[in-house]
């Protein structure tokens, strides 16, 4: 989340020469809290550089760039024209690594990735994302009411930061009713998820 401090590890490997040194590291999308000194790389020996980063408060949430603006009928709106044609949004946080190879100076960008493991799938990698403190989603994208019978609608709330609390309610068309009107949540732990059940009743006459 914006303003959060995270720890990252930059791993480098020189395959066939010992004349490579890391001169500098610049972080885009976050403030680097740790200092970096020039570090030579040893041949065929993995080198890990530990980084402490603070996500900038102004960092936007990770989202497909074509969904950042409200679309018109059949047309997406993209404010930054340089993004058009890219298959995905630029990484939220990336590192520009400056190297010296003998007498040659060069740099390259590395996106920050999240690495984790699942018992059934092994090691997985995905782009690091900046998310809001709270995520709210319906269990089903579509709920069909074929008659005037009430139906249950489940809403999932997940926290991405500790100590998140608030109230949740459903926005419905006029003449529709819901029980209860609101429900409260208090999520003390990061990553915790809870589900809430609402009973929605349609009106006697069909509406949209």
Predicted regions and their residues:
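Short, surface-exposed loop/turn segments at beta-strand-coil junctions that are enriched for proline
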Residues: 41, 52-89, 102, 186-190, ...
